[in-house]
């Protein structure tokens, strides 16, 4: 494939990168045009930011123009943002932007296996795992719902990091008393479980998510409300630790001494957590009655859902629309508009089938330019063309009212872009649905449509109509194939790098 590289003209504020000729060589350089994106070394915790002001016109409403404001204000009282691929789509950025127009932002499932990256108005990067992405907006209350599994040391570390950067959490973060506690030992046995699976490993984040949900399902888990009863907490924790030791010989339970130490630790945690603990079911339903606007922030994505994802290479919770009701305790009839977030190409971290995966120069380029390394593990993400079959399947399950197409700017270097539009079986017949059979999925052939690239920097554009014709054709072809309108388009990491269609 013939691709064109960029001439770099930005002044980096924080970066470990250098602009070298390597990128031009890799991309088969044959022309010049300007762009502010840098080729960066693998370091997912560092982001290059330009000190130059954007070329976009100044707009009101915190960077949202009139068209965007109309889109946002039309969203229903209870709306949601969910992943439409395999995670890492950019949900946090959309939630951060929408949160300014909502009273409450709520997490309904998952745990610290989420990694949502957002930026404040000064361009400072925040990586959130448990705290909802609405936290940077002072008027927003952030709810951690009953469906979330909460690792208290991680939560407090996150809160401390926010506080040290001037972001107050006092009175703004509510933790469900029904949420289950994720302990350090859950993380340890998560790793032991992966070691047991050997070559069949799932590729978890080793954050203890699966073991904690397992404790919940077999009904010996410990909930946040149990911290109010430390007289029985010790007995419950002893049962959990004993079960882990019986199941995993390599897990060393130190008996009474270890138990006593852990109980004392959680007594301190309980005292600190108490101001945050709330009956969030009562709180959210009360807010609905008071006509407050609520935005639900999904974590992971549909293709990682425990039921509808590429099982067993999935997460341990319901990351589709149905998880909103079970994870927050609200009725299905109150859930309104859902926005699916779709990256302009496809990525996946960890194991599992990947029909449109790209190997070689193009895949390496997308990984490097897009900083495609897992927010949790730092593992390089696998990259591929946009899989229309999978996206259509996700839209069918969730009933998305609209989509957010993120990272469109990352395709600006490509002279040709492919869309995976059809799955074909080995015998040549068309597969009309996304298969549950992974063996079948690994052997399907993908039929592609090839679209022209636009080979120009779009990161400073702020009106959809100003996009190059080829970029608009790419967006509109996705809409045609999927059958869901794209209302939001991400064209860079910054808060204002958004287009409204």
UniProtKB/Swiss-Prot annotation:
Which prosthetic group or cofactor does it need?
A: Mg(2+)
Pathway of action: Purine metabolism; AMP biosynthesis via de novo pathway; AMP from IMP: step 1/2
Residues noted as binding IMP in the record, renumbered to the chain = 88-91, 113-116, 205, 219, 300, 315, 379
Q: Where does Mg(2+) bind?
A: 88, 115
| A Pfam family assignment | Adenylsucc_synt
Q: Which superkingdom heads the taxonomic lineage of this protein's source?
A: Eukaryota
* Residues annotated as the enzyme's active site: 88, 116
Amino-acid positions noted as binding substrate in the UniProt annotation, renumbered to this chain: 375-381
Reaction(s) catalysed by this chain, per the record, are:
IMP + L-aspartate + GTP = N(6)-(1,2-dicarboxyethyl)-AMP + GDP + phosphate + 2 H(+)
| NCBIfam families membership | PRK01117.1 (NF002223), purA (TIGR00184)
Family, as annotated: Belongs to the adenylosuccinate synthetase family.
Give a short account of what the protein does: Plays an important role in the de novo pathway and in the salvage pathway of purine nucleotide biosynthesis. Catalyzes the first committed step in the biosynthesis of AMP from IMP.
Q: How does it assemble?
A: Homodimer.
- In Swiss-Prot or TrEMBL terms, this protein is called Adenylosuccinate synthetase 2, chloroplastic
